[in-house]
A protein has these predicted regions:
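Short functional micro-motifs and their immediate structural scaffolds
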Residues: 50, 63-65
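A broadly conserved sequence feature marking short terminus-proximal activation segments
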Residues: 1-37, 106, 146-147
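Short metal-coordination and nucleic-acid-contact micro-motifs, chiefly zinc-binding Cys/His arrays
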Residues: 35-38, 52, 69-71
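Cys/His-enriched microdomains
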Residues: 40-43, 54, 124
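Cys/His-coordinated zinc-binding microdomains
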Residues: 46, 60
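OB-fold (S1/OB) nucleic-acid-binding surfaces
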Residues: 91-109
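Well-ordered alpha/beta subsegment
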Residues: 106, 111-151
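Conserved hydrophobic positions within beta-strands
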Residues: 73-76, 115
Length: 151
């Protein structure tokens, strides 16, 4: 058992200030402490879904649990923010990329974050990405990196 599994709910909320941690998503934040991206999967129909919900939106089963995903996929949508709410580690002096990635685990399974280690000109729809991690305010957050940056 890891430290992430032993952490109390109150301590979990303190590790991720400003995040809305609930009964339905606490396992996902514990996974982040292990640098593991967890998304809900239904035990009855096998479908993945995000964001976390207590009931499968496909078959209405309550047999859902947080399971790890690899985090490989393609950029489905990309925008550059020039302004936004204050957030640890976010610098709006240069446009800040926000992407929605369609994950390889299932068609239509999407996760939104940012891309790190790439020029904004290289962040484009259809680009292949892999899961990476960044530390923000002392807590790990899932981000994406381009698999093959443009030459």
């Amino acid at each position: 058992m890891s430290v992430a599994d032993d952490i109390s709910d109150d301590a979990l909320v303190q590790r991720f200030p400003g995040e809305a941690i609930t009964h339905d998503n606490a396992a996902h934040y514990r996974g982040r402490l292990r640098r593991e991206l967890l998304l809900n999967r239904c035990a009855d129909c096998g479908r993945w879904h995000a964001p976390p919900k207590p009931i499968c939106p496909d078959c209405w089963s309550s047999a859902v649990s947080a399971e790890p995903v690899r985090g490989d996929g393609v950029i489905f949508m990309a925008i550059l923010l020039h302004r936004g709410p204050p957030a640890p580690g976010v610098d709006y002096s240069t446009p800040y990329p926000v992407v929605t990635v369609e994950l390889d685990e299932q068609s239509g399974l999407r996760f939104t974050s940012t891309v790190v280690g790439a020029d904004n000109d290289d962040i484009r729809i259809g680009a292949a990405v892999r899961l990476d991690w960044a530390d923000r305010a002392g807590a790990p957050i899932p981000v994406f990196a381009l698999k093959e940056p443009r030459a």
